[in-house]
């Protein structure tokens, strides 16, 4: 995501929105830092980089100096996925996403776990204008359950591990496979970097 109130409800800030909702629902508060805001938990550290999306790797580099972090779970928006869909995977390339490219300059691909949330695309707008636009009320309606589900994934990751997240994701996919009316369309192949 991007820091600052002007970006708070942008589609491109969906990762921050998920973490903020997670913290609010669990009555936790992020501590403000210079390079990132953070929340230290017994088995994890949640960070929200203040370096802007395309320089997220700089914040990760700083976090590695403070804590012994062996892997990262990154939550971010994906313009190539239909609105309110989710893809979860480990490793892979940047798929043209500059924020992920920045992270991969610091981390090995296998150390990067991902939750990608679809924001859809407006073919009338340039991609940059679309991702930096605010989430519309009709989009919130579809995204709110996905944001809550992402919070559940974060809980599982913190309490157990990434495999627990993948198991819950598999159950979710089966339960909503092909359910287009709710916006929860079962994702395609998980190992593809296309559309990252």
Name every feature range the model reports, one short phrase each:
Residues 2-91, 101-115, 122-126, 141-188, ...:
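Nucleotide and nucleotide-moiety/phosphate-recognizing core
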Residues 87-93, 131-135:
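Short glycine-enriched, charge-decorated loop/helix-capping segments at active-site entrances
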Residues 96-99:
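Hydrophobic alpha-helical segments within soluble ligand-binding/sensing domains
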């Amino acid at each position: 995501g991007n820091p600052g109130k002007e970006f708070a409800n942008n589609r491109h800030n969906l990762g921050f929105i998920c973490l903020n909702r997670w913290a609010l629902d669990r009555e936790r508060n992020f501590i403000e830092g210079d390079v990132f805001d953070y929340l230290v938990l017994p088995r994890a550290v949640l960070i929200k980089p203040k370096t802007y999306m395309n320089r997220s790797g700089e914040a990760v580099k700083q976090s590695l100096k403070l804590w012994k972090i062996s892997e990262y779970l990154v939550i971010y928006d994906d313009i190539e996925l239909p609105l309110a869909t989710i893809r979860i995977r480990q490793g892979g390339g940047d798929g043209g996403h500059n924020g992920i490219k920045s992270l991969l300059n610091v981390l090995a691909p296998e150390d990067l776990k991902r939750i990608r949330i679809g924001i859809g695309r407006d073919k009338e707008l340039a991609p940059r204008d679309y991702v930096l636009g605010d989430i519309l009320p009709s989009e919130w309606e579809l995204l709110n359950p996905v944001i809550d589900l992402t919070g559940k994934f974060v809980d599982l990751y913190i309490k157990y591990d990434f495999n627990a997240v993948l198991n819950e994701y598999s159950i979710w996919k089966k339960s909503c496979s092909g359910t287009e009316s709710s916006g929860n369309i079962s994702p395609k192949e998980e190992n593809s970097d296309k559309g990252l």
